[in-house]
Regions:
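Extracytoplasmic gate region of multi-pass secondary transporters
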Residues: 48-52, 267-324
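Residue-level signature of mid-helix packing/kink "hotspots" within the transmembrane helices
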Residues: 46, 73-81, 141, 175-176, ...
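Juxtamembrane intracellular "pre-TM" segments in multi-pass secondary transporters
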Residues: 13-24, 231-274, 300
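Glycine-rich segments within core transmembrane alpha-helices of 12-TM secondary carriers
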Residues: 161-187, 319, 323
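Cytoplasmic membrane-interface "Motif A"-like loop-to-helix N-cap segments
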Residues: 89-100, 332-340
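Hydrophobic core of transmembrane alpha-helices in multi-pass small-molecule transporters
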Residues: 106, 121-142
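C-terminal ends and interior cores of transmembrane alpha-helices
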Residues: 101-122
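Cytoplasmic helix-loop-helix junction between adjacent transmembrane helices
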Residues: 132-172
Length: 340
């Protein structure tokens, strides 16, 4: 059943004179694929935050909507942990686009609770919204793991910090587009679906338009991404760049079982736990601001939805310079010692 996710077999290595040009071409192609693909996930991740101010006008209370909002975060955390082990044993070229398409389809269905139930059946609408937003979060959890897999196979340890920092800007690019998409998606396409009923235009801008774009992004990502260098007839990145991490062995190129991943490399990795705990507090601040920013800006500051959308855009883009500097420092100053 899951054979379509299996990593592709290693091909016979190309002639030596073709390896350098092929490697350079594939590396940029693959990097572009995971950058665009990961940005696509953020086009269909936190859209519900943009919808909250409009949903409140339909009679939904913020306490109820906060439950729906939290389902996304819970599902995302669980999925990154569980689906990450599946990703480690899957073809990144298939796994990433599949997750993005499923997230986009789930996002499209988010119009259903308002369209078919509305405030008249508020409890049912909240339950359906919560389930759908849980699915959006779950499928979004399929985005980071294949990108991490691709990055470690195509970029060596001493360049990985810089490349990771550039790639990590993808989530800021994708997240920044949510606000403008909500505004212009409603403006351009809202009347196609709802005629003169402008109160529902936000459903198209917030859910349907970004989801349609994300599906197109998934197709582009599939065309660009390749799983490993060996599947393209190339040597490992360590051999190609003569850049071996400490304690490197050819055995590290093997596909591990879920048991080996969890019990040898996750549960007993103290540094991983330190980073996870620290990151949890960072995300409390980050998403505490991000999730409620559109509502706060509209209700407390008097912003209209267009102004709130562009403020959302600015918040995400402001993170890009710091991300790039940190990645460069981890390579050039700390020599690949990310934990430092």
């Amino acid at each position: 059943m899951w054979n379509f996710l299996a990593p592709p077999a290693h091909k016979q290595e190309l002639p030596a004179e073709k390896i350098d040009s092929a490697y350079k071409s594939y590396r940029w192609q693959v990097f572009l694929g995971i950058f665009i693909g990961y940005a696509g996930f953020y086009i269909v991740r936190k859209n519900f935050s943009m919808a909250i101010p409009e949903l409140a006008q339909f009679g939904f209370e913020k306490g109820e909507l906060s439950i729906v909002l939290s389902m996304n975060a819970v599902a995302y955390a669980l999925s990154k942990f569980l689906m990450g082990s599946v990703s480690d044993r899957s073809n990144a070229r298939v796994f990433l686009p599949l997750g993005l398409v499923l997230a986009a389809v789930s996002m499209m269905f988010m119009i259903g609770p308002v369209q078919f139930f509305g405030p008249e059946q508020k409890s049912l609408a909240i339950i359906v919204m919560a389930v759908l937003n849980f699915l959006v979060g779950w499928f979004n959890g399929m985005g980071w793991p294949p990108c991490g897999r691709v990055m470690t196979h195509w970029f060596s340890v001493t360049e990985r910090g810089t490349m990771m920092s550039i790639w990590n800007c993808a989530h800021n690019v994708g997240g920044a587009l949510v606000g403008p998409m909500a505004v212009y998606g409603a403006l351009w396409f809202g009347s196609w679906f709802y005629g003169a009923d402008a109160s529902r235009y936000f459903l198209i801008g917030t859910y349907v338009f970004p989801a349609a774009v994300a599906i197109l992004v998934a197709l582009v990502a599939y065309c660009l991404i390749r799983d490993t260098p060996q599947s393209c007839g190339l040597p490992t990145i360590e051999k190609y760049r003569n850049d071996y991490p400490k304690n490197y062995s050819e055995k590290q190129e093997e596909v591990l079982t879920a048991k080996e991943i969890f019990f040898k490399h996750v549960f007993n990795n103290k540094m991983l736990w330190y980073i996870a705990i620290a990151n949890a507090f960072v995300y409390m601040v980050r998403y505490g601001c991000l999730d409620w920013a559109p509502t706060f800006l509209k209700e407390a500051q008097g912003y209209d939805i267009k102004q709130a959308g562009w403020a959302y855009f600015a918040y995400e883009f402001a993170a890009i310079p710091g991300t790039l500097v940190c990645g460069w420092l981890s390579d050039k100053v700390f020599k690949g010692g990310r934990a430092m």
